[in-house]
């Protein structure tokens, strides 16, 4: 018998929300139950729960701590956690864009470790943040030097036209 059937038979309501403090290799969620006339209350509880959930997000350029676009993260409730390096599988480029920005691409053969900042981005703010990202940047999995996998900025290959490689520097500087 599934949860939905149990709720209906018992005259209850329920809402499922994702939970990200467990092992991130498998999806995990929590179901909040209440009496059928309490839907508004469990929606409020779910909303509060989601506001406390966050995902680690890696940035290598203009969104780094103290850089010009950091406010795009902090205004959405993101908080700086740490400065770390990626695993040695990335190449970094100074893109030919206005404004100029870095582009990081995965390359397990000629890559190097790149300096990134990790922010905790509230789950409820992810959509608003994604709406601000412009091509050729994209979001993907970024492997850190300690083996963690986090979401972060990457660059699509076509964005490297006329770009200057700065992998040997190991970080982006304004």
Where in this protein do the model-derived segments appear?
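Glycine-rich, small-residue loops and helix-cap segments
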Residues: 4-55, 93-97, 123-126, 136-138, ...
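GGW-centered surface loops in extracellular recognition modules
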Residues: 55-65, 69
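Short Gly/aromatic-enriched secondary-structure transition segments
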Residues: 69-86
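RNA-binding accessory domains that recognize and position tRNA/RNA substrates
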Residues: 78, 93-97, 102, 143-146, ...
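Basic, polyanion-binding surface patches
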Residues: 84-111, 119
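Mid-chain, well-packed structural core segment of small domains
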Residues: 104-148
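C-terminal edge-of-domain segments
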Residues: 145-174
């Amino acid at each position: 018998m599934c949860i939905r059937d149990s709720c209906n038979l018992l005259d209850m309501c329920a809402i499922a929300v994702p939970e990200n403090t467990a092992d991130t290799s498998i999806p995990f969620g929590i179901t909040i139950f209440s009496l059928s006339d309490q839907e508004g209350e469990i929606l409020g509880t779910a909303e509060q729960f989601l506001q406390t959930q966050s995902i680690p997000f890696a940035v290598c350029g203009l969104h780094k701590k103290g850089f010009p676009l950091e406010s795009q993260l902090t205004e959405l409730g993101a908080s700086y956690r740490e400065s770390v390096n990626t695993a040695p599988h990335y190449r970094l480029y100074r893109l030919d864009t206005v404004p100029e920005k870095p582009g990081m691409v995965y390359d397990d053969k000629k890559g190097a470790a790149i300096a990134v900042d990790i922010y905790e981005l509230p789950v409820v703010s992810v959509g608003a943040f994604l709406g601000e990202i412009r091509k050729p940047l994209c979001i993907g999995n970024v492997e850190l030097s300690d083996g963690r996998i986090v979401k972060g900025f990457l660059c699509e290959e076509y964005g490297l036209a006329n770009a200057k490689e700065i992998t040997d520097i190991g970080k982006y500087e304004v």
